[in-house]
Curated annotation (Swiss-Prot):
It comes from Actinobacillus pleuropneumoniae serotype 5b (strain L20). Its cofactor is [4Fe-4S] cluster. Catalyzes the isomerization between 2-isopropylmalate and 3-isopropylmalate, via the formation of 2-isopropylmaleate. Binds 1 [4Fe-4S] cluster per subunit. This is 3-isopropylmalate dehydratase large subunit. It catalyses: (2R,3S)-3-isopropylmalate = (2S)-2-isopropylmalate. Coiled coil: none annotated. Heterodimer of LeuC and LeuD. [4Fe-4S] cluster binds at C347, C408, C411. It is an enzyme of class 4 (lyase).
Amino acid sequence: MAKTLYEKLFDAHVVYEAAGETPILYINRHLIHEVTSPQAFDGLRVAGRQVRQIGKTFGTMDHSISTQVRDVNKLEGQAKIQVLELAKNCEANGISLFDMQTKEQGIVHVMGPEQGLTLPGMTIVCGDSHTATHGAFGALAFGIGTSEVEHVLATQTLKQARAKSMKVEVRGKVNPGITAKDIVLAIIGKTTMAGGTGHVVEFCGEAIRNLSMEGRMTVCNMAIEFGAKAGLVAPDETTFAYLKDRPHAPKGKDWDDAVEYWTTLKSDDDAVFDSVVVLEAKDIAPQVTWGTNPGQVIGIDQVVPNPQEMADPVTKASAEKALAYIGLDANTDMKNIPVDQVFIGSCTNSRIEDLRAAAAVMKGRKKADNVKRVLVVPGSGLVKEQAEKEGLDKIFIEAGAEWRNPGCSMCLGMNDDRLGEWERCASTSNRNFEGRQGRNGRTHLVSPAMAAAAAMFGKFVDIRHVELN
């Protein structure tokens, strides 16, 4: 029987299944951070249980840490408690931890692939909704709750119902200036923020195949933003080249054997998907969100939609509420919207490719006077090291940006990088919900190049018309 890639991955990891019961999956890799793991370890202690397979779990610090200092003792309140608890729990259980004293530390979804912890064919979980990022490698990766974190620590398994399969095909080549972020925002704009609900999505087509691994991670990262359980890209030579010689990747004959297996990880030609979505790559323009969910997005060359022209009453009401919060009028030209802050970072867009794209725009330019702050936050210590080796940090600083240490930073209002009330931000992150970047902050999701251009020109501009250096 023909199978989709998702079905192959799921079936390969079922350790127990009975009629009328939810299947139990084996979990190959468990990634943890400081926010969703403390209660899980407390649960283990209360129950008198131990971590079942120590070598399958890896931790890092990212969500609540400061990107300005690397000293745990200078953290305050809940952030300090969370970070110290993670360190204590990892030490007590023999779990490998990339803490703030190591250059390998970083955002969990940047660190995992860098270290070769993310491999094709794996099941990967983390107490974080953007775990779908790792699906870019042909791994079944999804976010779990804290009680499930405890369950995986104790058993290395997880109850998981089968999802439906969706294929999203992006046909042809994108035009110059169009990035992975634009592709995935265009997908979400077409499907809406709930279009993938109940599905695991496989991204395919020439435009997806042409992406680097960094780009594929950006696409899979945002699968959750249109309701999908996970996102997948079948592994290929691009995948293998990225993973070769990574610290935790197989070596020697084990590598050869692994690649032989990984090449089988693809949907069968006659596999049947429950849903199919098709986009033409040539039609995708640089994307900017105008509302308060990632599905409220349009091309930079368009105007803010008019709710009065929306036939569906629910869509209309949602748009009216979003525009009231975001402070925009219908029919406003997207190129006439000024910004107060710019954030380049997050698990969506903080890899070296993203920083290079931003630097190409910012080189030789200065931050616009109306832009109060530009934060550039690398996704890991290794990304930071590489960027500094290439001199990107100097480009950012000379342009008027702040060059920070790795962490989740302004993606979410959980640390000391936040928007002021009613400030408008061009952000490379993944969510533009109300208050996501700080109380009453207004977030517009864009690509790194678009964010950098907004910083330099003080408003959203069409990156296709900006000279790159």
